[in-house]
Amino acid sequence: MSSIYLDHNATTALDPRVLESMLPWMQRQSGNPTSRHVFGRSARDAVEHARTQVAEACGAYASQVIFTASGTEANNFAVKGIAGNQAGSQILYSAIEHPCVSRPARAMQQAGWLSDAIGVDAHGVLSTAQLQQQLQKPTSVASVMLANNETGVIQNIAEIAEIVRKAGAFMHTDAVQGLGKVPVSFTDLNVHAMTVSSHKIHGPQGAAALILDKRVDIQPLLHGGGQERGLRSGTENVAAIVGFGAACELAVANVAQFASHTQMLRDTFELGLKALDVTIFSQQSTRLPNTSFFALDGIEGETLVTALDRKGYAVASGSACSSDSTEPSHVLLAMGIKPDLARGAVRVSFGAHNTLLQVTDFLTTLKNEILRLKQLTGVAA
């Protein structure tokens, strides 16, 4: 039985065209990009071409792109690096941030910084009133994600950034889930720093970037040979960076088609969900077109995910980076969802290659598995 992949917010398959662009840097002798000979110069040219591709995809300048190995690394770099070059004050982050933002913010408390979470409403939208109140304390940096990896809710980052800027703080956004699904512009978002990642847009794992306003004073992430403007030393992963650049170019070219196709699949799916007596989260908010997050009373999300996996459907019970946790989704708890319902949460995230037939077949399987699990629960009770 072949499995149907419905977990594209966790990671995506490598596009064959991206792999083709990477192969020369994996199969042939290539130089260190810092070397002066022809092999090194060729590698440097490839890295700089990819930097331009990433910049153009993000509405930024190539000089603002700093390559990292992951979105987690870029987010840690932004939070710790920006705060670290200022006097100990406050770091703010939304209550629905990925752990790779919230945990480094809290870790900075050991070095004398304060950290605090900005609340969201019942639909997953950030409270700007609370943000303004919290900004009355001296603040180094505020980090609010563009689009949530679980609910898909899109924040009004430009408005939030203006509030943060007026308070004299720096603004960072994790745009990992937004790139390739909705138009993303570093300039239009009005932020000082922005994170994007390769493996969410059919590029290779092991490549990401922090887009950084050059006027921001930030501590280096890694000290060494001085690569990436002296901010992230270490020999560049040329093949992965080349792949990231190619993936960015393809993602931007296809973003409108991706959005219309996946929203059609999601709308069809959620119409079918309504007949199954489930709770769909954040339906009233602006969301990523491909993402649906729902829950059933009385059925654990992990149990349903495992059951669906056995039937050939790959979905998630929340963030892939916290899938080893048995705790309810922190995103749903921040939205005021009761823990018992939050434990039943399941995320479906569609991709460009999913089909309407797959959606209708999945709905049939989902209905059958829900009925089966309810019967088992009834017997157990």
What are these regions (language model features)?
Residues 1-381:
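Pyridoxal 5′-phosphate
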